[in-house]
From Swiss-Prot:
Its EC number is 2.8.2.-. The keyword Zinc-finger does not apply. The active site is at residue 135. Sulfotransferase that utilizes 3'-phospho-5'-adenylyl sulfate (PAPS) as sulfonate donor to specifically catalyze the sulfate conjugation of flavones and flavonols. Strictly specific for the position 7. Substrate preference is kaempferol 3-sulfate > isorhamnetin > kaempferol. One of its GO terms (biological process) is flavonoid metabolic process. This is Cytosolic sulfotransferase 5. Keywords: Cytoplasm, Transferase. InterPro entries: P-loop_NTPase, Sulfotransferase_dom. It comes from Arabidopsis thaliana. Belongs to the sulfotransferase 1 family. The gene is SOT5. GO terms for molecular function: flavonoid sulfotransferase activity; sulfotransferase activity. Induction: Up-regulated by trans-zeatin, but not by cold, heat, hypoxia, salt stress, auxins, gibberellins, wounding, etiolation and salicylic acid or methyl jasmonate treatments.
Amino acid sequence: MEMNLRIEDLNEETKTLISSLPSDKDFTGKTICKYQGCWYTHNVLQAVLNFQKSFKPQDTDIIVASFPKCGTTWLKALTFALLHRSKQPSHDDDHPLLSNNPHVLVPYFEIDLYLRSENPDLTKFSSSPRLFSTHVPSHTLQEGLKGSTCKIVYISRNVKDTLVSYWHFFTKKQTDEKIISSFEDTFEMFCRGVSIFGPFWDHVLSYWRGSLEDPNHVLFMKFEEMKAEPRDQIKKFAEFLGCPFTKEEEESGSVDEIIDLCSLRNLSSLEINKTGKLNSGRENKMFFRKGEVGDWKNYLTPEMENKIDMIIQEKLQNSGLKF
């Protein structure tokens, strides 16, 4: 997902900043540093700095935000399908989601666009609204948005399922198995808050508070609710985006068509997602695993469950947020 720049290939601003930041190793053995309360690899930190400095937001922009492995691919597909359904109905044989991975249609600021350039050419995003995505926490994102009133949709997920999916994804990503930590070691690091884009609880709370302070511009969604009540959740999402379903659309089955098109079952079965690759070389199939609620029960011991539950209870105390 990210280019592998050596430390000497980073610009001077980034190298100087890194030398002053707290650092640690993530569970793959990669050096990460803590900037504005969040852990980043050196490459991604440089991209975050580029984004904060150079991005020129438009008030019509839509940004999909998430902590890694919380349902980002699914939410990107839904966002694209909802916003483009008037010109590109979900039942069209040439719908872009049938031939493109959702991460191509909704690129990341810090992993795609600003990783490769300090000031990337965004003119190809000429249609309005422009669609972008990010894994950075809210306060870091807002610095790049410079007071814009664009809309942000955030997807959260139960911390235990997030951890399991996170470990599987980065284990598949890592080619040198000798430096992969065990699930138990990864669990301990995660509980300490040492994970790429972590700590998890700080990340989630940053967007939760944003949604309470400005519900017209920040929508906080939960993976579990989307799985349990897809029609209600997607209708609410469309309302937030400013493209609510008409009575005629609902009667014609448009909501269910979008649910089917964007389902993980359908997306993972597409040829582009079985054999295709992103520009980075990452295989599209890596973004699809189970997408289930409760898979953590196959991995966490009762002691692990109790420990992480106590941490989450403490970190989310008095916030009003529950999983």
